[in-house]
């Protein structure tokens, strides 16, 4: 998921201006912006003789709409876990065969099963690329200065208006991802974060409406604000929340997976239904799932590899933290987003936009 706008990530990758005709000498990948290691394209061409062409997006809804529209020309796409069920039901992606993807054998089956339990219709249609969580990044000194008894490991830190009001002056941002934020509010209330109940959803929006006046921005790009020290609290993806520690070696910001429950998200490989070269799709997936490539991807994105790569962050500050490694004792408080229908998602989107404009 997740956004890190770094020009170097594109330097060795051909940019795609629009849908393209099939070309056996190239493979077309659709992915989050800044979400592959900079040397991926060069290494892929060296290994296969094929040129990697990249098209990127900045929001999960953008990718979902693009794949639903068909006619993309993509051989492979990386999409957010919560969108896959809808893509399957719409016939926008095709099943994946494993015979041409031997590196898939090393995928973390425990995490994959958690995902399939939440989205059973995705089975056979996807493979995980990278994992992460949605939690709270906070400037410990700034928060404790304003809230000496702050509940640093709880969603109450941001969802209790008494706390949010005292942190507003130093800056609160919330990731612009309605399904994730509603689930977090449900967890804070002690409700099922996967609930579809209208009453529960209403209660979650009640929590969000109460703190909205204290929120500086709802934004998918929180990376620069955190690295630049512009906010003191962010409900954010771990890829952004861990950036100050993993990339700058500073402990100014801490990243918490709240005790009430934390969303585990995945960015997953899917093959568009109109992909023209299925052999190329499998070839690129297998290449990107190779342990050395996954180690590079995990380091570059601050995400969690979908395959076992103990060397991914060996010896690097912060890579042994629970949020960066997800050891067994950290997995007990994880949940995944449910697979909502298109109609359910549209209702959430409408409420979310009204919330953001103060209605």
Which residue stretches match the model-derived regions?
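Early extracytoplasmic/lumenal segment of secretory-pathway proteins
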Residues: 23-90
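Periplasmic-binding protein-like
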Residues: 201-210, 248-273
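Paired acidic/hydrophobic, glycine-rich loop segments that form the ligand-binding mouth/hinge
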Residues: 74-79, 232-237, 254
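Extracytoplasmic ligand-binding site segments that recognize negatively charged/polar headgroups
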Residues: 84, 88-213, 221
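A bilobed periplasmic-binding-protein/Venus flytrap-type ligand-binding module shared by bacterial periplasmic
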Residues: 137-142, 187, 265-277, 296
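Conserved C-terminal helix/tail region of periplasmic/extracytoplasmic solute-binding proteins
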Residues: 328-359
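Mature extracytoplasmic/periplasmic domains
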Residues: 272-333
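A ligand-binding cleft/hinge motif common to bilobed small-molecule-binding domains
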Residues: 83-86, 233-251
